[in-house]
């Protein structure tokens, strides 16, 4: 049995993760900003914890983590485009930094960061395996939701800088759908012009969270043809991140 704390615990992926994890016998604490979200969490057998990443201090979060002492922290929080650039910065970047600080204070090491495919430094050339279609799509995506990507990149970059304190894995799913998961994925250096079911995302997050051989790997992922556990095993053996953050 593994104990998880999920920041952003009311999101679609978080709720699917909670359902899958609790059905497998694990314990999940879903951290949300408002107790009104409790009903949805209870339906999937999660345990609601109220903590606003915008208002809490690292010490507040550390106290909460110390009381639960989870085996794994999952960061799935995000402003979701609500509240403008200031709120995106406050949740996606500053909220993440608070969690990193809190984990260090509380002595918790394992973190799964749910990021996004193509989260990269746009001042640098695109990855060499990108096709012309990938490059065109990348430019459109970053023009559309550049603020999100900017702060998500800074959060991921800072996490990599803290590798001595945090045993992180950064998971970067492609665009997501609400279709039923096939249980099969593609991991690694993949096209960004693809989609992934949220159920497959949640199942992949769980299996990576339970795999301590994936520490300090960056993983791009989408729906594919390989069973999730086999895809993870192959990725871990290869040990090559999908992207390298400059630090």
From Swiss-Prot:
Annotated keywords: Cytoplasm, Nucleus
Keyword match Cytoplasm: yes
UniProt-listed SUPFAM superfamilies: NAD(P)-binding Rossmann-fold domains
Annotated CDD domains: SDR_a5 (cd05243)
Subcellular location: Cytoplasm; Nucleus
The keyword Chloroplast appears for this protein: no
GO CC annotation terms, alphabetical: cytosol; nucleus
Gene Ontology biological-process annotations: heme catabolic process
Main location: cytoplasm
Highest taxon, organism lineage: Eukaryota
Signal peptide positions (record): none
Family statement: Belongs to the UPF0659 family.
PANTHER family associated with the record: FLAVIN REDUCTASE-RELATED, UPF0659 PROTEIN YMR090W
Protein name as catalogued: UPF0659 protein C216.03
Species: Schizosaccharomyces pombe (strain 972 / ATCC 24843)
